[in-house]
């Protein structure tokens, strides 16, 4: 899938610049991250469609809540990436970037919304909806486990372990890479349960 692949690309690109200062590497990496977040919108839409398929009222409510949380987190990370891009364009060196970041983060609500709780919602929404899909056997049981592992790696290792975290998210989202058959057990075209059979990112 393109979205997690771009996160992987961001993580690898970031590791090539130990100074993390303004320049082509910073810009390229954050453009990849921005594109990844934008592409996660249809990913969450696909997960939502799978989770609510043949689900009861509670299942649909759960899927909708998880999707909204995931999209809110996606928005927060996108805003953060755009801020990073803008700072990179304006600053001449890393100290100048730090001063600009301080100015941005001095505004009330920016830190929790864009750098704190906001981005965490991406992980919460993704794990939540994958757990729901696994409970209904739409994906393998280890799909949400891979997402949890990816989240744990990101939390423990920070951005330096982003490539490993992205690879785990690749595994968790692999079911979405399968082409749906024309019909399935539900009797409706294109709505066969998706099983985890291969890892592709």
Cite the ranges covered by each PLM segment.
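Hydrophobic, aromatic-enriched alpha-helical segments typical of multi-pass transmembrane helices
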Residues: 1-201
């Amino acid at each position: 899938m393109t979205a997690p692949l771009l996160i992987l690309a961001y993580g690898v690109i970031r590791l090539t610049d130990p100074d993390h200062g303004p320049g082509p590497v910073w810009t390229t990496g954050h453009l990849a991250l921005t594109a990844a977040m934008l592409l996660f919108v249809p990913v969450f839409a696909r997960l939502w469609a799978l989770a609510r398929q043949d689900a009861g009222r509670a299942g649909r409510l759960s899927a909708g809540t998880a999707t909204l949380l995931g999209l809110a987190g996606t928005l927060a990370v996108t805003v953060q990436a755009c801020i990073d891009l803008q700072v990179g364009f304006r600053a001449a060196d890393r100290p100048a970037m730090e001063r600009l970041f301080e100015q941005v983060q001095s505004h009330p609500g920016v830190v929790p919304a864009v750098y704190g709780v906001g981005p965490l919602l991406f992980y919460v929404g993704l794990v939540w909806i994958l757990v729901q899909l696994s409970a209904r056997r739409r994906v393998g049981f280890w799909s949400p486990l891979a997402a949890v592992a990816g989240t744990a790696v990101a939390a423990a290792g920070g951005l330096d372990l982003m490539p490993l975290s992205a690879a785990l998210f690749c595994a968790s989202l692999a079911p979405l890479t399968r082409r749906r058959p024309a019909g399935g057990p539900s009797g409706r075209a294109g709505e066969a349960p998706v099983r985890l059979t291969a890892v592709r990112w």
